[in-house]
Amino acid sequence: MGGGDLNMKKSWHPVLLVNQERVWKAEKVANEEKKMLAQLRKEREEERQLEELHRLQEASTGKKRVEKLDWMYAAPSTEGGALGGARIGERDMEEYLLGKKRVDEVLGQGDKNIGAASREFIALQNANTARDTAAKIREDPLLAIKKQEQAALAALMNRPDIRKQLRAAKKAKETKGREGESKEERKARKRAEKEERRKSKHRYHDSRSPPSDYYDDRDHRRHRDSYDSQDRENRRTYRDRSDRSRTRSESPKREKKEKDYSNRDRDYRRRNDTTRGSFDESPRKGGGNRWGSHGPDGYRRSDHRDDGFRERQRGDRIPPPRHLSYNHSTPDVRPSSPPSSSAAPVNRNTSTLEDQRAARLAAMSASADELYSSRSKSLAARAEEERREQEKDEKMRQKYGKEQASANFFSQQSQLGLGEALQRRGGKGLLKDI
C-alpha cells in the first residue's frame, strides 16, 4: 500500500493553503506600507515646493508670511526669532519680562518696518516713468489700428473721385429728402429761396449805387407782386379746402354758398383789375406818346414820365392774360439815372406819382378788407352749418343707433317679471321681445 508524499503533511510545506494564505497576507501588508511611504514622500515633496514658493514670494514682496501656529510663540527676544529677524535691546527685553511693555507694540513696529521696506522696493522699480508710459502708448495695438484707419481715411479723402462720390451722395440725400414734401411745401421753399436771392441782390445794389426813383418804383412793384401772390395763394388754399369739404359732404346748400363765394371772388378780381387799369391809364392821359418818356432809340429822356409807362407795363404783366398789353413794341427800360434838366418838373411828377401810389394802396387795402370780411362771414356761416349738420347726425345716431337699442334692451329687462325672466333663462321667449 502506497503511502504518498509525507512532506505534504508537514506544517511548513508551501503547498498547504494555510501557508499560502499567510504569505498572501504578508505581501499585502508590505504593499500597503510601500504605498503609504510613497504617499508620505509625495506629500513632503509638495510641502517642500510650497515652502520654496512662499520663500520666493517673501523675497519679492518683502512681507514675511506668518505660520498658522507662529503667533503662539511670537515674543521678543535678543536673537530675533519670530519677529522676522528684528532684534531688541536688553532693556526692552527686561521691560517685557517685567510686564512694563506689551508684545503687540513690538510686533506692530516690526510690521511697519516691513511695509516701509516694501514701499521703498516698489519706488525703486521706476514702473511709471515718462519713458515707460511713452513706450506703453507707442506699443499699444489699438492705437496703432486707429492710426492706420485715420491714415486710410485721409488718403481716400484726398482722391478726387471719392470726393465726387461723396458730393453726389450728399446731393442725392438732399433730393430724396425733398421728394417727400408736398406741392405747397415745394412752392414755399422755392419762394423763400427766390426771396433770399432777391434780398442778397438788392443789398449788393444798395451797397454799390445810391437810391433813385427807379429803385423806389421797383420796391412798390415788389410790394404789389407779393400782395398779388399772397392773394393767389389764399384763393388756392380756399379752393383746396372747398374741394375737401365737397368730397366730405355734397350738400345743395353748400354748393350754392360756394358758387356765391366764387362769384364774389370773381367780382372782386374784376373790380381790382378795373381799379388798377384806371390808375395805370392816368399817366397815359397826362401826355406823352406810346413810347412813354423813351424815344425810338431806347434812351431815357429828362421829363421822368417813364414811371407811368413802367406802371402800365407792370399792370399788364401781373394780372391774368385777359388784359390788353401795351408793351409789345416798347424797348427795354434801362435803370440809368436821367440827367435832370430842371428841378420843378421833377418835383411835380414825383408828387403826382406818390399820390397815385397812395391812392392805389388805399384802394387795394379797401378791397382786401372787403374780401377778408366777406370771407370771414362765409367761413363762419359754413362752420355754423357744419355744426348743425353734426348735431343732426348725432341725434339720428342716438335715435337709431346701437346706444338706443342697448338702452331699450336694459329697460325691457328691468320691466320683466319673475316668471318671464325664469322662462328666458330656460331658453324660451328669447326672440319674442327683442
From Swiss-Prot:
Coiled coil (UniProt feature): 20-61
Keywords assigned: Coiled coil, mRNA processing, mRNA splicing, Nucleus, Spliceosome
Chief location: nucleus
Top-level taxon: Eukaryota
Keyword Cytoplasm: no
Record's subunit section: Associated with the spliceosome.
Protein name, UniProt field: Pre-mRNA-splicing factor CWC25
Function: Involved in pre-mRNA splicing.
Record's compositionally biased regions (Low complexity): 359-381
PANTHER family hit by this protein: CELL CYCLE CONTROL PROTEIN CWF25, PRE-MRNA-SPLICING FACTOR CWC25 HOMOLOG
InterPro entries xrefs: CIR_N_dom (IPR019339), CWC25 (IPR022209), CWC25_splicing_factor (IPR051376)
GO BP terms: mRNA splicing, via spliceosome
GO cellular component terms, A-Z: Prp19 complex; U2-type spliceosomal complex
One Pfam family of this chain: CWC25
Subcellular location per the Swiss-Prot or TrEMBL entry: Nucleus
Disulfide bridge partners, by residue number: none
Location of the region described as Disordered in the Swiss-Prot/TrEMBL record: 43-63, 156-412
Basic and acidic residues bias locations: 43-57, 171-198, 215-284, 297-319, 382-402
Family to which this protein belongs: Belongs to the CWC25 family.
